[in-house]
Amino acid sequence: MLRTVEPDDIAIFFEHQDDPVASEMAAFPVRDRAAHDQHWAKILADESVIARTIVDDGQVVGNIGSFVADGERAIGYWIARQHWGRGHATRALADYVAEVPERPLHARVAEHNVGSIRVLAKCGFAIVGEDQSDGDPVREIVLRLDA
């Protein structure tokens, strides 16, 4: 189930991202508490962001959201590692794309994160390319949902 992000969720999101295994899988740096809170304050203040908390049986299991970057709506999500493999990402993404009608939606995933690539494909995203920023060791798979 998706719901609006509540202030108490931010501390839970911090715990989720403070996991080196999950951080490596997502190719996203672990932030200290101050940087994490500042990051979420910026997210929630940005009117282009549509952020949701992912809840299962009353427990926060992750978050999903989209934002506008370079004129394109990009989507991202995070599932706490202890909840991986239970279908939360697929259900959340399916619900999210049903809620957010704007198309196309874009996603970038570290190429080693095959689980996330599968989730996006199940929800209709197609691989449209690959990218690697200068100096960044992580190659990304670029996906798009058109309909």
Stretch-by-stretch model annotation:
Residues 21-41:
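Conserved GNAT-fold acetyl-CoA-binding loop/helix
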